[in-house]
C-alpha cells in the first residue's frame, strides 16, 4: 500500500472520529465568543471562519459574539481621544461610546461577516440593539478605596445585561443564517451601553439554552500556571471553577470568562469550552475529537 493511500485512509479515520459528535450535536446551538489573537492574525481569522461555516454545514447552529480586541484602542489613538480612568477603571463617555460602536458594529462586525461569507456562510451582522436583542442597564462598579471603604463608581456608558430577547436570533438560526452580534445593549429609554463581550456571550447562550458556549482566547484554557502548558485543566466542574475564582488562581481577563461560563451553565447550557484561537482549527479540534484541546467546564 502506497503512502498516498495510507494518508487517504488516515483522513477518512479523522472524518469518522467526528461522526458521533456531528450526530450528537445536530440541530443544537453553539454560542461562540470570538476574541483575542484570532481576531487579528489573518490566518487565524480564516481558520475560525472556516470552522464556524463547517459547523453550520454539518447541521450545528453557531451564533457568534465578538469583542473589540485592540481595534478600539487603535481607533481612539487615531482620533486623539485619551482614555479616561476613575480609580483605575476606564470610563466610557459619549464620545468614547461613539468610537466603540463605530469599531464594534462597523469595522469588526463587518469583517467577521465578510470572512464567513467568503467561506460560504450566510452571516448577518447585528448589534445587541438590533431587534432589542439585549436590554441593558448602567453598571455601577463597586470598589474598595485605600481606606477600605466600599464605593460605587460610575463608569459612564458601561452597562450590564438585564434581559436577552432571542426572537430575532431564533428567526435567523431557523432560516439558515449565522448571527454575528456585537456587545452593545439598549436600556428602556433607548440609551446605548457598551457591554463586556464574554458576559454577553454567556447571557445569550443561557437565553438560547445553547448546547455549548465556546470562548476563543489567547491561552490554551484554564491553567494553574499561565507559563506552563502542562498545568492546563482539560476538564472542570462548575464547583471546581468557582473554587479557583475564590482562591485567586483565576485572575485578570480570565475572570469574566469564568463568570460567564458559570452563568451559562446555571442557565441551561450543557458545557463551556475555553480554547486557544492561535491553534489552527481550534474549534473543530475541541468539538470533534475525544480529547479536545482546551478546557471543558460542565455542571456538577
From Swiss-Prot:
GO annotation terms (biological process): arginine biosynthetic process via ornithine; L-arginine biosynthetic process
Gene3D superfamilies: Acetylglutamate kinase-like
Catalytic activity: N-acetyl-L-glutamate + ATP = N-acetyl-L-glutamyl 5-phosphate + ADP
Name of a matching Pfam family: AA_kinase
PANTHER family reported in the protein's UniProt record: N-ACETYLGLUTAMATE SYNTHASE, N-ACETYLGLUTAMATE SYNTHASE, MITOCHONDRIAL
Metabolic or biological pathway, per its Swiss-Prot or TrEMBL entry: Amino-acid biosynthesis; L-arginine biosynthesis; N(2)-acetyl-L-ornithine from L-glutamate: step 2/4
Name the record gives this protein: Acetylglutamate kinase
Location of the protein in the cell: Cytoplasm
Binding locations of substrate: 68-69, 90, 194
HAMAP family: ArgB (MF_00082)
Amino acid at each position: 500500500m502506497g503512502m498516498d493511500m495510507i494518508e487517504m485512509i488516515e483522513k477518512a479515520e479523522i472524518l469518522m472520529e467526528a461522526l458521533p459528535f456531528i450526530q450528537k450535536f445536530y440541530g443544537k446551538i453553539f454560542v461562540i465568543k470570538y476574541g483575542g489573537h484570532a481576531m487579528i492574525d489573518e490566518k487565524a481569522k480564516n481558520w475560525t471562519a472556516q470552522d464556524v461555516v463547517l459547523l453550520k454545514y454539518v447541521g450545528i447552529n453557531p451564533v457568534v459574539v465578538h469583542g473589540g480586541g485592540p481595534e478600539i484602542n487603535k481607533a481612539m489613538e487615531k482620533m486623539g481621544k485619551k482614555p479616561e480612568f476613575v480609580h483605575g477603571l476606564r470610563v466610557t463617555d459619549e464620545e468614547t461610546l461613539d468610537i466603540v460602536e463605530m469599531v464594534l458594529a462597523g469595522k469588526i462586525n463587518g469583517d467577521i461577516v465578510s470572512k464567513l461569507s467568503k467561506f460560504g456562510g450566510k452571516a448577518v451582522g447585528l448589534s445587541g440593539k438590533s431587534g432589542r436583542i439585549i436590554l441593558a442597564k448602567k453598571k455601577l462598579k463597586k470598589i474598595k478605596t485605600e481606606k477600605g471603604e466600599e464605593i460605587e463608581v460610575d463608569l459612564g456608558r458601561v452597562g450590564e445585561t438585564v434581559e436577552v430577547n432571542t426572537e430575532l436570533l431564533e428567526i435567523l438560526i431557523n432560516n439558515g443564517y449565522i448571527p454575528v452580534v456585537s456587545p452593545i445593549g439598549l436600556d428602556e429609554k433607548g440609551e446605548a451601553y457598551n457591554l463586556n463581550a464574554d458576559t454577553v456571550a454567556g447571557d445569550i447562550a443561557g437565553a438560547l439554552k445553547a448546547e455549548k458556549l465556546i470562548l476563543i482566547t489567547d491561552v490554551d484554557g484554564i491553567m494553574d500556571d499561565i507559563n506552563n502548558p502542562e498545568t492546563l485543566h482539560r476538564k472542570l466542574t462548575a464547583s471546581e471553577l468557582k473554587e479557583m475564582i475564590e482562591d485567586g488562581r483565576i485572575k485578570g481577563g480570565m475572570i469574566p470568562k469564568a463568570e460567564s461560563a458559570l452563568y451559562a451553565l446555571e442557565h441551561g447550557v450543557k458545557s463551556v469550552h475555553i480554547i486557544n484561537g492561535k491553534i489552527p482549527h481550534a474549534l473543530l479540534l475541541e468539538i470533534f475529537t475525544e480529547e479536545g484541546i482546551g478546557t471543558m467546564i460542565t455542571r456538577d
